[in-house]
């Protein structure tokens, strides 16, 4: 796979996993003459169903692989089409899947995503890398990276023989033990202490067969539930069930140690015991395949950040070499697509003779801000996962905001368009408003969690019965010129403001007894009343009246009728 004996490259990428291979392909596609060397420490092809998190693609990551890297045909023919995300709440009915609130679609999502076997995907991408004239060296262990503005010196060992090459650019895609991050002391702690354990079974696990209730089964066509990324949700935890293309199934437990100590599930036997306690039906099914366990892995306190991602001194961190948040909603490949797109833009412009000093600063700041905003989706939220009504509203917001803004910007190259980014990041611009809306409503969910709410069960919900969610998902990938993109961003922001206002009305009426039709400023939502009994959320230039179409959609997932009682323990 290593064709050239060159000692000088324009780009050296350390790490031949998904991030490194896709970056090499993206750079080569945009600038075909670029000389690239990829160094990968594993000596052979990755095994099928290889032991990595990241089997489930969300829409942004799927767009990156399908459209940016031209892998649409490959993903359609060689991997599984994903039947979206599927959530099973109501943990009080963990022994009966038919009693749990089930949320997902009844048809394949309009914009497709996939379940991928990471071993197969990376092996096939490695072949594509070589076919495209990129040098890929397996069994290469990085030993040193001497960085200099006028050129880097990269040292590695191959077959126990020291080698050195020069490069104009050095990209670290070595994963969470990032060589470059340690060298430059860029490690940054993240206040999100969550642990995970996961294993693969050489067996097909189909939730359709967890009950013989024909009415429950018939909610969707046979076989489709299995193709979803299925989530079993409970207080302080979630469990994933993900199918892989050749038959195996990935099972994972992700939990907050404030509720579920890491040592209660940090071995396979402990994981099964934990499942018997918290997800007894799932445990009884999985017990039948105990002899078909392919592997087991744990990851303690998996979230981390970086002080910097990109530099005009011609280095960058790609994928998990930079930062990692949380596997919920499968954002891993999203961030690979985002970071690789920023890196590709910097590399190709620099190699073409352009000054990238400003762009590197803008992209680094954008990555940090996006990562910080994304973090509010997860931080201090695990205690709410067993509160079904809260989570239904959170799902609405998390899906709507993700499809309305990051997907729109990414698919239209907005994140690498300085004109668009200037508009997005301007004072009180869309970026600021988007971040503030997200922070406010995530805080609302946490505040709501301090109140007891009625248990919700016995509902099967089609997410695309909500017209605005169906529209936002179906619009992913639509292309706009600069003027129309800005207009679409504004339009989507107005919708998001209405969603926040309506969710707040429902919650405030439930908890505080406020009028259900009051005007609401979505940027000032607060469950606490002022001294005179009024609410700061009402009135002002940003206050919104009820939007009856948005209200009708949200009411399809609203089941609370009794006023909530305060209970500070969540």
Residue map of PLM features:
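C-terminal helical "tail/cap" subdomain of flavin- and related membrane-associated enzymes
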Residues: 347-570
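Beta1/beta-strand and adjacent pyrophosphate-binding region of the FAD-binding site
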Residues: 4-19, 37
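N-terminal FAD cofactor-binding segment of flavoenzymes
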Residues: 47-95
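Helix-loop-beta segment of a Rossmann-like dinucleotide-binding subdomain
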Residues: 97-118, 153, 254-258
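Predominantly flavin-linked oxidoreductase catalytic cores and closely associated redox partners
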Residues: 46, 128-282, 340
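Short beta-strand to alpha-helix junction loop
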Residues: 60, 106-127, 261-266
């Amino acid at each position: 796979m290593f064709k050239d004996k060159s000692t000088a490259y324009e780009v050296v990428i350390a790490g031949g996993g998904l991030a490194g291979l896709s970056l090499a392909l993206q750079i080569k596609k945009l600038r075909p003459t670029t000389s690239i060397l990829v160094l990968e420490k594993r000596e052979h092809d990755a095994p099928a169903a290889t032991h990595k998190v990241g089997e489930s693609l969300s829409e942004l990551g799927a767009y990156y692989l399908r459209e940016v890297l031209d892998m649409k045909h490959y993903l359609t023919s060689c991997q599984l089409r994903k039947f979206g995300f599927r959530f099973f709440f109501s943990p009080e009915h963990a022994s009966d899947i038919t009693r749990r609130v089930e949320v997902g679609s009844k048809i394949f999502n309009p914009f497709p995503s996939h379940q991928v076997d990471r071993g197969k995907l990376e092996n096939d991408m490695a072949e594509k890398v070589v076919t495209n004239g990129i040098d890929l060296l397996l069994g290469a262990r990085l030993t040193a990276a001497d960085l200099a503005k006028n050129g880097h010196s990269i040292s590695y060992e191959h077959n126990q023989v020291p080698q050195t090459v020069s490069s104009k650019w050095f990209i670290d895609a070595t994963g969470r033990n990032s060589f470059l991050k340690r060298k430059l002391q860029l490690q940054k702690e993240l206040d999100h202490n969550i642990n995970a354990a996961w294993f693969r079974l050489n067996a097909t696990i189909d939730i359709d067969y967890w009950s013989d209730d024909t009415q429950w089964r018939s909610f969707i066509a046979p076989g489709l539930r299995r193709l979803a990324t299925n989530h079993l949700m409970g207080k302080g935890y979630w469990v994933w069930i993900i199918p892989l293309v050749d038959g195996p199934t990935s099972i994972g437990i992700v939990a907050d140690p404030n509720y579920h100590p890491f040592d209660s599930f940090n071995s396979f036997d402990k994981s099964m015991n934990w499942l018997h306690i918290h997800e007894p039906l799932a445990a009884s099914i999985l017990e039948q395949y105990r002899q078909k366990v392919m592997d087991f892995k744990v990851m303690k306190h998996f979230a981390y950040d970086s002080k910097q991602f990109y530099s005009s001194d011609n280095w960058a961190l790609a994928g998990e070499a930079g930062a990692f948040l949380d596997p919920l909603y499968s954002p891993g490949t999203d961030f690979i697509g985002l970071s690789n797109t920023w890196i590709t833009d910097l590399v190709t412009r620099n190699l073409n003779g352009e000054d990238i000093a400003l762009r590197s600063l803008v992209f680094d700041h954008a990555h940090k801000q996006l990562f910080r905003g994304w973090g509010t989706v997860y931080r201090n939220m695990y205690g709410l996962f067993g509160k079904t009504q809260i989570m239904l509203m959170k799902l609405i917001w998390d899906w709507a905001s993700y499809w309305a803004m990051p997907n729109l910007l990414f698919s239209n190259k907005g994140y690498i368009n300085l004109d668009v980014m200037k508009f997005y990041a301007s004072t009180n611009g869309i970026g600021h408003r988007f971040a503030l809306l997200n922070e406010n409503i995530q805080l609302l969910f946490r505040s709501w969690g301090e109140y007891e709410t009625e248990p919700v069960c016995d509902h099967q919900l089609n997410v695309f019965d909500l017209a605005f969610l169906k529209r936002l998902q179906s619009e992913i990938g639509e292309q706009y010129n600069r003027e129309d993109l800005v207009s679409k961003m504004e339009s989507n922001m107005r919708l998001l403001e209405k969603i926040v206002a309506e969710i707040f009305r429902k919650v405030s009426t439930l908890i505080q007894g406020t009028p259900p039709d009051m005007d609401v400023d979505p940027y000032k939502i607060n469950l606490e009343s002022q001294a005179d009994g009024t609410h700061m959320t009402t009135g002002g230039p940003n206050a919104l009246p009820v939007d009856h179409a948005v209200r009708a959609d949200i009411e399809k997932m609203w089941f609370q009728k009794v006023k909530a009682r305060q209970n500070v323990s969540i």
